[in-house]
């Protein structure tokens, strides 16, 4: 996921 984007920043996780």
UniProtKB/Swiss-Prot annotation:
<comment type="similarity">
    <text>Belongs to the FARP (FMRFamide related peptide) family.</text>
</comment>
<dbReference type="GO" id="GO:0007218">
    <property type="term" value="P:neuropeptide signaling pathway"/>
</dbReference>
<keyword id="KW-0964">Secreted</keyword>
<keyword id="KW-0527">Neuropeptide</keyword>
<dbReference type="GO" id="GO:0005576">
    <property type="term" value="C:extracellular region"/>
</dbReference>
<protein>
    <recommendedName>
        <fullName>FMRFamide-like neuropeptide YMRF-amide</fullName>
    </recommendedName>
</protein>
<feature type="modified residue" description="Phenylalanine amide">
    <location>
        <position position="4"/>
    </location>
</feature>
<keyword id="KW-0027">Amidation</keyword>
